[in-house]
A protein has these predicted regions:
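Topology signature of small-to-medium multi-pass alpha-helical membrane proteins
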Residues: 1-123
Length: 123
């Protein structure tokens, strides 16, 4: 359970930071309102899953899988917008999306194998 919460916290912080960059709060030069909105929504979904894992611990795994999957889908939509030319196309944005995909896939793998991993830790 703590691993799931830790991972959701990490992902929510990453999307929140990206939203702040795209809003021009942390760094100037990468402003993009639609990207900031999308990253904010994804970050809030991840925070909701984190909150749900505290309130209803038995649903942690399901909430994490659902929220990480939604975040991955949103990130893939972001990559699609970059490819077709309507999303931000800086090197920062490309690296950001590649990093998001890698971390989300790692998180999904970690959560999906969570019970096996937890059983090995207890043995």
């Amino acid at each position: 359970m703590p691993v799931i919460r830790w991972w959701l916290s990490l992902e929510a912080a990453a999307f929140g930071g990206a939203a702040l960059v795209h809003a021009g709060v942390l760094v100037h030069g990468y402003e993009h309102a639609k990207a900031a909105t999308a990253e904010s929504v994804i970050g809030l979904v991840l925070l909701f899953a984190l909150f749900a894992s505290v309130v209803a611990p038995r649903s942690s795994r399901a909430m994490a899988l659902a929220s990480l999957s939604l975040a991955l889908l949103g990130t893939l939509v972001g990559i699609f917008t970059i490819v077709i030319g309507i999303g931000p196309r800086s090197a920062f944005d490309i690296a950001l999306h590649v990093g998001f995909v890698a971390s989300l896939l790692a998180g999904l793998g970690l959560v999906a194998r969570g019970r096996v991993w937890e059983q090995r830790q207890r043995a």
